[in-house]
Amino acid sequence: MSKSPAIPFRTARQLATAIRKKKIGCLELLDLYLERIEAYNPGLNAIIAMDADAARKQAKAADKAVKAGKKLGPLHGVPMTIKESFDVTGYPTTWGNPAFRNHKAEENSLVAQRMIDAGVNLFGKTNVPLNLADWQSFNEVYGITNNPWDLSRTPGGSSGGSGVALAAGLTGIEAGSDIGASIRNPAHYCGVYGQIGRAHV
């Protein structure tokens, strides 16, 4: 399975199943995404913050857990990125607003923590428009995110970086947010599946 070009586009559930069945390793899977990020993200600007070293360390630990036969979370080892507006410890949370350029989160948001508890390897953040208030994804902190199907077009917003990261095969799963179509709009523009989450999920 590890040589298939379709792997980066598998669903999170498919990836988690492959990890459990030892068809692919957690570090091996992460490195596939990191290679694609290096190749494609410069033109897309979907992922705007990342900690590859910490992610590799986490992936190695996840591989050891699989090998040891430990109880695994439902998304064990699946690489994940998350919308910039969600707090993740040590990562910037600016909402694309220059006034908060130097702000870094001191703890995880509920969404981030629940995904981590489910076993994901959260390794980066994705771009948004200023204050999450537009159907495009440009801000003065991180610049513009481009549609993976046509770089001259918008990926939508406000979860534009999220939609692009999924469509371009840069991540295994994403978390966005939606009040006024902020998931629905980028999902449509980028050709991916988007679902509005609920607080109890």
Please name every model-derived segment.
Residues P74-V111:
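Enzymes and membrane/adaptor proteins characterized by extended Gly/Ser/Thr/Asp/Glu-rich
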Residues M1-K57:
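An N-terminal boundary/leader segment
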Residues A52-L75, R101-A105, M115, W135-P155:
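Flexible, acidic active-site loops/lids enriched in D/E/S/T/G that coordinate Mg2+ and/or position polar
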Residues E107-H200:
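Short glycine/serine-rich loop segments
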Residues D63-F86, V120, K125-N127:
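Glycine-rich, aromatic-flanked loop segments that form ligand/cofactor-binding clefts
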